């Protein structure tokens, strides 16, 4: 077996399959592009779904990739086992209707055992198969020459993710030898069992069935191959490392943590877990941020925050008590740079995000500690013996407090923790995360009709909006038909078409179709699996037939407005980077006739000054009357020019480059203006946050921009008229009105306070005495909770003491407040517990501290009865 670095193993794999006629697909970003079924790209096949379900036909049916991936369903095990990771690389080869089981098995065996490639000893390799897959068993036995004792049948060897392609699989295992397990009585000591001796290195999935929505399985029109090899596992075998963490993918990170902490790796199991957690999590966080994700409280941003906080918590085991994770980013970049340059290219930005998050977490830990102390204090005051699971979960989820830390503090106070309650809260959170995506189909059932339509259809709409063409195919209800009549809908493929198919954010063209026998309207245009433009039409008159000569006419007005917005989007993209920084990446867009929408990654708020600057830049480029040059060139040449690519998009060897002078250069297949002056005017309509680290700008151009400005001007004029001033002086007039309003409110609050004080004389006169405790429970006139609190303040000022409960009716609701003096608290009275009982008696709920609480009710008619209960409650406390 060769001695190889991780980079060499990765490259050998890709070189092998390139030699076997495979196209090497680039690794896609970790943030999925247009796939709502997953938070992260979590496998090599995740980027290939469109090929497997037949919605897109690849140029080459043989493909291979090295795909960076994230899986976070088992975070708590990372660091505690030899091979659990949140970030990993999956090496895979794929066949879409080309070679099948025999080809996949022969390729895998050659790569693993040939001295030219990996050179494993064949005797150390075992395989597992699905019991009913006789074909695979025969191939392993007869084509490869494996003996029966090296072929293991396992019932779970069937790959099925629900609706879509599925099939049996065959896993390849490497025997690491007796040093990793030699107890023959161990029921798990076999390839496929839970042991460290037989290590799975490659899974070959034979997709041969459609799993249909009704639960049945039918043969696929085209059989596929999907394989996955974990790079980290392969490297651990080749480098003879006890675990994945002792390979060259992790050890440089661990060595850097040793330098920061002054603690050595390999001397303590507890310390080693911390080293492994940090080494794993920094890889995940660095790559995810580099691919556009940012820490937040939701979705993938929440996962990043959780990973960072978990690493920081474990760092305390290594006596690291200050921000440090950001210092590891350059190490990650250096390890991975030969194949993944994105971390090294964005080191400064990634470090900035991580350091900010670390600093925030150290502050949050202190806040969490303060809350924990309050929880412990309240538990002791109420004689509770256990910290509630909900409280433990809140500390864990919001403040990053590990359960173990909460448990230590609880033990110091003689308390226990509710582990079962905590686990129930964790399960609820996991269920919520699953249900958020449960109704989204992860893959479609593989179709046959469109995939078999291979005649080429040329798009001619870059240079014209009208064209005479021929109908190649008419489709109704997934069936090819010869004609479609008036009043019906159909799908059409033409020999040539000027109609743009929706892609790259630009909406599809609309327009008309005319033949000698019929007229139809184009409602929508999408890409068919074989890259033809597929038109959805409604027939308005007569009949359209296959083979008809037709006149195609794009709606020129809509097209003209759309292309203004598309070129403006390119200008905005560049202006965003110039204003906010090069870290800005496109996260989605919409280019339609009436507006444009641009989503982008950014980790902070955008100021009015920044928005104004971006808008000015775009308009300056419009008024400079810059020619828009569009040409096709090799992708290498485009990259040398500095062309921006759509984040997450895959491109061929020849690309279409759209250049707006020297200001904006992008790879784009859309339609654009010839000169920026054609845009006329650009106006930002709104800027909002739409998710974790993602913001959205909506804007208009041309006539729509003029209309927007005119509407704003009219609104300003109307406001000025109402204020009896000029438009120029409207801001000063509004400021004066706000100042006047603040003064009126101040005077009103003062008056209410005086009224409350005056009313208090009657309310607090002659309190009821129960067992030596003064009790006041009355209905009062108070417009809101603030006024009720003023009554409580007056009660405290008068030093009446005892127990106070006040209620007020506001419309169809009840406001309640209670207070208990310090001496009454010592006697065992609790304002929060009292008010909870009172509130339930008038249709509400609430609670609070021992000294003060407030609540609401929904049944004003029962307020009197609820207040009468106060005396009863006080007597019960004395019993």
From Swiss-Prot:
CDD domains: AlaRS_core. Consists of three domains; the N-terminal catalytic domain, the editing domain and the C-terminal C-Ala domain. The editing domain removes incorrectly charged amino acids, while the C-Ala domain, along with tRNA(Ala), serves as a bridge to cooperatively bring together the editing and aminoacylation centers thus stimulating deacylation of misacylated tRNAs. Catalyzes the attachment of alanine to tRNA(Ala) in a two-step reaction: alanine is first activated by ATP to form Ala-AMP and then transferred to the acceptor end of tRNA(Ala). Also edits incorrectly charged Ser-tRNA(Ala) and Gly-tRNA(Ala) via its editing domain. Binds 1 zinc ion per subunit. Its cofactor is Zn(2+). It catalyses: tRNA(Ala) + L-alanine + ATP = L-alanyl-tRNA(Ala) + AMP + diphosphate. Its main location: cytoplasm. The keyword Membrane does not apply. It is found in: Cytoplasm. GO terms for molecular function: alanine-tRNA ligase activity; aminoacyl-tRNA deacylase activity; ATP binding; catalytic activity, acting on a protein; transferase activity; tRNA binding; zinc ion binding. GO terms for biological process: alanyl-tRNA aminoacylation. Keywords: Aminoacyl-tRNA synthetase, ATP-binding, Cytoplasm, Ligase, Metal-binding, Nucleotide-binding, Protein biosynthesis, RNA-binding, tRNA-binding, Zinc. This is Alanine--tRNA ligase. The lineage of its organism: Bacteria, Bacillati, Bacillota, Bacilli, Bacillales. The keyword Transport does not apply. Belongs to the class-II aminoacyl-tRNA synthetase family. Its EC number is 6.1.1.7. It comes from Listeria innocua serovar 6a (strain ATCC BAA-680 / CLIP 11262). HAMAP family: Ala_tRNA_synth_B (MF_00036_B). It holds the Pfam family DHHA1. NCBIfam families: alaS. One of its GO terms (cellular component) is cytosol. Zn(2+) binds at residues 566, 570, 668, 672.
């Amino acid at each position: 077996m060769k001695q190889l670095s991780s980079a060499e193993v990765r490259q050998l794999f890709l070189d092998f399959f390139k030699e076997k006629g495979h196209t090497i697909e680039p690794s896609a970003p970790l943030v999925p592009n247009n796939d709502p079924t997953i938070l992260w790209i979590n496998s090599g096949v995740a980027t290939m779904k469109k090929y497997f379900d037949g919605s897109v036909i690849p140029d080459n049916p043989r493909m291979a990739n090295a795909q960076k991936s994230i899986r976070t369903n088992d975070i708590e095990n990372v660091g505690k086992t030899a091979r659990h990771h949140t970030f990993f690389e999956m090496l895979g080869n794929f066949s879409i209707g080309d070679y099948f089981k025999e080809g996949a098995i022969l390729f895998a065996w050659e790569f693993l055992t040939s001295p030219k490639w990996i050179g494993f000893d064949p005797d150390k390799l075992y395989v597992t198969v699905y019991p009913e897959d006789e074909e695979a068993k025969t191939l392993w036995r007869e084509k490869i020459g494996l003996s029966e004792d090296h072929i293991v049948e396992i019932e779970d060897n069937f790959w099925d993710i629900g609706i879509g392609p599925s099939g049996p699989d065959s896993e390849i295992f490497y025997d690491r030898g007796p040093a990793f397990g030699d107890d023959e009585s161990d029921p798990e000591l076999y390839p496929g069992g839970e042991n460290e001796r037989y290590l799975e290195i490659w899974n070959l999935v034979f997709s041969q069935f459609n799993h249909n929505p009704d639960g049945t399985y039918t043969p696929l029109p085209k059989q596929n191959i999907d394989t996955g090899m974990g790079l980290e596992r392969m490297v651990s075998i080749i480098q003879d490392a006890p675990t994945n963490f002792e390979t060259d993918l992790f050890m440089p990170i661990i060595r850097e943590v040793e330098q920061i902490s002054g603690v050595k790796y390999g001397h303590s199991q507890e310390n080693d877990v911390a080293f492994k957690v940090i080494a794993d999590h920094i890889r995940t966080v660095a790559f995810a941020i580099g691919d556009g994700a940012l820490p937040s409280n939701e979705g993938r941003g929440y996962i990043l925050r959780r990973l960072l906080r978990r690493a920081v918590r474990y760092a305390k085991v290594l006596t690291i008590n200050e921000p440090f994770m950001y210092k590891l980013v350059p190490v990650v970049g250096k390890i991975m740079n030969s194949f993944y340059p994105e971390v090294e290219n964005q080191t400064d930005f990634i470090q900035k995000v991580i350091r900010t998050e670390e600093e925030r977490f150290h502050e949050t830990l202190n806040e969490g500690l303060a809350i924990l102390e309050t929880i412990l204090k309240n538990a002791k005051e109420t004689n509770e013996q256990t910290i509630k699971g909900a409280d433990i979960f809140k500390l864990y989820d919001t403040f990053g407090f590990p359960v173990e830390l909460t448990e230590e503090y609880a033990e110091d106070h003689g308390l226990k923790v509710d582990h079962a309650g905590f686990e129930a809260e964790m399960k609820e959170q996991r269920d919520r995360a699953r249900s958020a995506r449960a109704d989204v189909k992860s893959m479609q059932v593989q179709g046959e009709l469109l995939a078999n339509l291979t005649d080429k259809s040329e798009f001619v709409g870059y240079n014209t909006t009208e064209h005479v063409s021929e109908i190649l195919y008419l489709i109704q209800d997934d069936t090819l038909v010869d004609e479609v009549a008036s009043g019906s809908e159909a799908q059409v493929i033409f020999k040539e078409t000027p109609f743009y198919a929706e892609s790259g954010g630009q909406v599809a063209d609309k327009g008309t179709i005319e033949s000698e026998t019929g007229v139809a309207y184009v409602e929508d245009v999408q890409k068919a699996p074989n890259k033809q433009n597929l038109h959805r039409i409604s027939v308005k008159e007569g009949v359209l037939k296959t083979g008809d000569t037709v006149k195609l006419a794009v709606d020129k007005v809509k097209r003209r407005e759309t292309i203004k917005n598309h070129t403006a989007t390119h200008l905005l993209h560049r202006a965003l980077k110039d204003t906010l920084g090069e870290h800005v990446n496109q996260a989605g867009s919409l280019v339609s006739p009436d507006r444009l929408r641009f989503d982008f990654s950014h980790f902070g708020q955008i100021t009015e000054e920044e928005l104004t600057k971006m808008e000015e830049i775009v308009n300056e480029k419009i008024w400079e009357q810059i020619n828009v040059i569009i040409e096709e060139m090799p992708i290498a040449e485009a990259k040398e020019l500095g062309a921006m690519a759509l984040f997450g998009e895959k491109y061929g060897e020849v690309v279409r480059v759209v250049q707006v002078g020297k200001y904006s250069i992008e790879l784009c297949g859309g339609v654009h203006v010839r000169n920026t002056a054609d845009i006329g005017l650009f106006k930002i309509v709104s800027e909002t946050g739409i998710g974790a680290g993602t913001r959205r700008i909506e804007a208009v151009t041309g006539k729509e921009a003029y209309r927007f400005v005119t509407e704003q001007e009219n609104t300003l004029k109307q406001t000025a008229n109402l204020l009896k001033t000029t438009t120029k002086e409207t801001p000063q007039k509004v400021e004066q009105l706000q100042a006047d309003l603040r003064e009126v409110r101040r005077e009103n609050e003062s008056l209410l306070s005086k009224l409350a004080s005056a009313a208090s004389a009657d309310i607090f006169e002659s309190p009821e005495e129960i067992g030596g405790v003064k009790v006041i429970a009355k209905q009062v006139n108070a417009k809101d909770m603030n006024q009720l609190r003023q009554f409580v303040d007056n009660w405290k000022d008068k030093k009446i003491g005892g127990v106070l409960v006040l209620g007020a009716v506001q419309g169809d609701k009840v406001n309640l407040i209670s207070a208990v003096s310090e001496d009454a608290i010592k006697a065992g009275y609790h304002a929060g517990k009292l008010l909870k009982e009172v509130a339930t008696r008038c249709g509400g709920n609430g609670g609070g501290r021992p000294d003060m609480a407030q609540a609401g009710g929904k049944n004003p008619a029962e307020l009197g009865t609820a207040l009468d209960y106060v005396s009863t409650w006080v007597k019960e406390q004395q019993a």
